[in-house]
Amino acid sequence: MMMRRLLPRFHLPVLLALLIIGASWSAPSLARPQPGHFVASPQQQAMVDDLERRTFEWFWQTADPKTGLVPDSAPGHSFSSIAAVGFGLTAYGVGVERGYITREQAVQRTLATLRFFHDAAQNDSEDDATGYHGFYYHFLDMETGHRAGRYVELSSVDTTLLLGGVLFAESFYERDTPQEQQIRQLADEIYRAVDWPWMQPRAPLISMGWTPGGRFIPADWKGYDEGMLVYVLALGSPTHPIKDGAWQAWCATYQATWGTFEGQTFLNFAPLFGHQYSQTWIDFRGIRDAWSRQHDLDYFQNSRRAALSQRAYAIANPQHWTGYGANVWGLTASNGPGGLIVKGAHGERTFYGYTARGAGLDDITDDGTIAPTAAGGSIAFAPEIVVPALAEMKRRYGGAIYNKYGFVDAFNPSFHTKTELRTGRLVPGLGWVDSVQLGIDQGPIVLMIENWRSDFVWKVMRRNPYIRKGLQRAGFTGGWLEQPVTPP
């Protein structure tokens, strides 16, 4: 067996901006589960309960209680991911709802987090700032709270994911106590400080980010992907809103990825995280913008079809990866064993490190690496295929991929090459298994499990006036948007 090491991958926003459009795979029509109300068996429900609790504990145990900063990955030494902080702020509410922690514990952790971001240095320094113009750097040093390195961008989407948790906190902690009043005040001020039009050097689109020296990333958020939430929050701002027409500009590129893949017709984005992140906080069931009215398909239904197509792709398994099947599937941005090019029985194969894996009309990036969050974060969309998949992955691979914090980030049963690994380990008889969890992959698991169980996060966010305003300015109508706000 021969191998050669690949150069490191691009940072993910730049990588996604450079994806080549048009790769596709089509297989014969397969029998697929039909939509309907799925009822988990007692054994399945117990498995999901255990996964939710363990995944919550990852956030609770790894965050710095003084600043609220959540590591990008753990265990091990890591910088903080501001997106992971947003998922964590929301997970604390789930912890209260499920009885994992007390409300007072959640209040204290949330206050510490909001105080840190509210008071953090906002300037154009290369090394001594946490953010600028209300946005925050993608990665922060866990000790100083400043930009983790000069390669780190001021990120519009990661700031948005942080704000998802900030706005959740504003709407969840509604009691008339001094501490919960302060949570609401801090959260509101953090959101109001974001200067969305400044991040539009090529308006009406929003740039992916900025670096000191006035350099905006030369790529904008264009549909369809996780950038959806960026536009909703930018449109909903009471202080620095973007102008009308931005949502229409975002939607203008939809047609390039609308089509049929693996028997499902939907708006494609190959990695499943693009279908999950915005819908972790916003309930898109029954609400539609002009595009979804025209196609008679809401975004929740679109994400359901994306999950179904990935399962069908795994069943077809065109690249003959080990382990793929009806209950072992799921491609998204995750860690991996590479980068290496290895020659073996199936010819030359490329294995990546961290990258955006996926399968769709827009792109196929598949090296045999399965990320449990791809299925787990889709549980609210398609529980009848996700719950059996989570159960089977846990049963088949056991403690190698499942530990005190739930599933490890990823595993690859096709990779057995003995080499120096950047992360993870080789398990005899299984293959490569990661040794850490990532905050941005843990978040969709715990939050979407609770949305599937009780609509909890969705119900809280329906009360947020900025979310409602952003959706309405984007042209969404119907469903819960037409109903009065339900008090907690």
Regions of interest found by a model, annotated:
Residues 26-28:
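N-terminal signal peptide c-region/cleavage motif recognized by signal peptidases
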Residues 2-15:
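Bacterial N-terminal signal peptides that target proteins for export
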Residues 13-24:
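Bacterial N-terminal signal peptides
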Residues 32-488:
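Ser/Thr/Asn(+Pro)-rich, low-complexity disordered segments
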